Amino acid sequence: MTKSVGIIGWRGMVGSVLLKRMQEENDFSKIIPYFFSTSQSGQDGPIINNILSKNLKDAYNINLLQEMDIIITCQGSSYTEKIYPKLRNNNWQGYWIDAASTLRMEKDATIILDPVNLNVINNALDKGIKTFVGGNCTVSLMLMALGGLFVNNLIDWVFVSTYQAASGAGSRYVIELLKQMGSLYNVVSKDLLDKSYSVLDIEKKVTQESRSKNFPLENFSVPLATSLIPWIDVEMKNGQSREEWKGQAETNKILNLKKKVLIDGTCVRISSIRCHSQSFLIKLNKDISLENIKKIIVNHNQWVDVIPNNMQKTLCNLTPSAVTDTLNIPIGRLRKLNIDDRYLSAFTVGDQLLWGAAEPLRRMLNLLVNI
């Protein structure tokens, strides 16, 4: 029987990417979709396959939600916190698929990334688990790149430095970044065409503008354009940011590892728009040749691609501009460190709105539709 699927939060960045991917893969032909809204119930919904979806449902109407076989939400944590307990307390037996972090670490929830943990997902389904949550964006992208090493139990620990896109913070932050860029350009646009101006004169104007009271800072609170922000999410008692804490906590839950893999690092916001990049220092638990490491990585899933460690291939393939709006997971700069042959460095890039957010949700929906 074709399943009824309630879709909530489809207007945001993750939700919009999800709808786009579902149309590309003809997923709507397999379900009966119902579009919900927290603010515009009764109005027109999205256009799917050139057909306008009419009469949006009220996303706070528990009775309507309970009629769904599956609910997939990209509405955010506050919505999940308000609605999910009410549904479960009313004995709703449907499947809940969620992009928000609220339920990730709950015992009765499974973090989904099926190219990496399909066995964990299937075991959860066999046990009657009905709550499935997308992972943290950097964690999911790391596992898509390093999955072969993880599933073959070759890693002792990982230290990661992230270079995270503005979109990871939300659409308002992307807009603010672009406004910051525009503001800086506007103050020097004429100077850039005047050869009498030195670079230092231009730099001074840019710096002064970024420090001015009129500079757009409502969301980031500090400049990101021409700068970076070495802190993401709230502060933990041990000195980590919560974003850094998620690396170890979520990875071990996703893989359901018996022996915990230690993961730590520093998470940094940069002025990329969609793609997160990550630099890894990996301690292997045995000495494996670099060629075997490459084979293990590339054989893990169809999306990961090992980029040869040379300048030209790296510049062409291992950047946010090359990867944005694709499902590609390039990994490069692979080399053994001079510290010891069991130490490996690597660098990877991935679109945080695709494998980092929407794609695992879409694929989980398809797993449930085919049950």
UniProtKB/Swiss-Prot annotation:
Keywords, ordered alphabetically: Amino-acid biosynthesis, Diaminopimelate biosynthesis, Lysine biosynthesis, Methionine biosynthesis, NADP, Oxidoreductase, Threonine biosynthesis
In the record, biological process GO terms are: 'de novo' L-methionine biosynthetic process; diaminopimelate biosynthetic process; isoleucine biosynthetic process; lysine biosynthetic process via diaminopimelate; threonine biosynthetic process
Detail the disulphide connectivity of this chain as listed in its UniProt entry. Answer: none
Active-site annotation: 137 (acyl-thioester intermediate), 276 (proton acceptor)
Q: Which residues bind substrate?
A: 164, 243, 269
Q: Which InterPro entries match?
A: Asp-semialdehyde_DH_CS (IPR000319), Asp_ADH_gamma-type (IPR011534), Asp_semialdehyde_DH (IPR012080), NAD(P)-bd_dom_sf (IPR036291), Semialdehyde_DH_NAD-bd (IPR000534), Semialdhyde_DH_dimer_dom (IPR012280)
- What EC identifiers does the entry list? 1.2.1.11
Out of the domains of life, which is the source?
Bacteria
Q: Where does NADP(+) bind?
A: 11-14, 38-39, 75, 167-168, 352
What pathway annotation does it carry? Amino-acid biosynthesis; L-lysine biosynthesis via DAP pathway; (S)-tetrahydrodipicolinate from L-aspartate: step 2/4; Amino-acid biosynthesis; L-methionine biosynthesis via de novo pathway; L-homoserine from L-aspartate: step 2/3; Amino-acid biosynthesis; L-threonine biosynthesis; L-threonine from L-aspartate: step 2/5
User: PANTHER family, per this entry?
Assistant: ASPARTATE-SEMIALDEHYDE DEHYDROGENASE, DEHYDROGENASE, PUTATIVE-RELATED
Q: How does this chain assemble?
A: Homodimer.
Purpose of the protein:
Catalyzes the NADPH-dependent formation of L-aspartate-semialdehyde (L-ASA) by the reductive dephosphorylation of L-aspartyl-4-phosphate.
Q: What is this protein called?
A: Aspartate-semialdehyde dehydrogenase
From which organism does this entry originate?
A: Buchnera aphidicola subsp. Schizaphis graminum (strain Sg)
The record lists the lineage as: Bacteria, Pseudomonadati, Pseudomonadota, Gammaproteobacteria, Enterobacterales
Question: What gene is this protein a product of?
Answer: asd
